[in-house]
């Protein structure tokens, strides 16, 4: 069965960095479909200007990979519902959906990391967008994405050494490794509703 890997987390959580190690070396997944990388390829000095075109290219590539039943990975903040239908379609096509969510303690930590990335030549994201995506992503993780994934895990990426917080399977039990952080995440998932 083919695999769809969802590499998720707020802006600055380390998704791309982790993807370049985990996907090819550990999971043997050679297809990483990333709109940010596509945009940077189209317009290296102004990737924001081609975001819509990059999104179209990304969706076309995903459709080709699914038609060919190839393993592939996507990267997302989960801040929108846009991938729920993709996940459902992939499951219908026989894909096994595996989600890894990289968690940071707060939107402030995410903003700090993004600012650091910008200082090193990375792309900028406005603070209000980072904050909205932080809470939106956590809320959607809990309410939309965990319920439709075959396997999922949440990793604390706020520390120097990453820590597994929780993992679970579709409609089955979950194993909580750090209950304090898991409770914090559940509280954060309600922040979007305020």
Where are these regions (language model features)?
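Pre-Walker A (Motif I) flank of P-loop NTPase domains
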Residues: 1-4, 68-70
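The Walker A (P-loop) glycine that initiates the GxxxxGKT/S ATP-binding motif of P-loop NTPases
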Residues: 6-9
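Walker A (P-loop) phosphate-binding loop of P-loop NTPases
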Residues: 12
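Conserved lysine of the Walker
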Residues: 15
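Conserved substrate/cofactor phosphate-moiety recognition/catalytic segment
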Residues: 19-70
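Glycine-rich phosphate-binding loop used to anchor ATP phosphates in small-molecule kinases
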Residues: 53-104, 137, 153
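A glycine- and Lys/Arg-enriched "phosphate-lid" helix/loop adjacent to the NTP-binding pocket
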Residues: 95-144
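NTP-dependent small-molecule kinase module
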Residues: 143-194
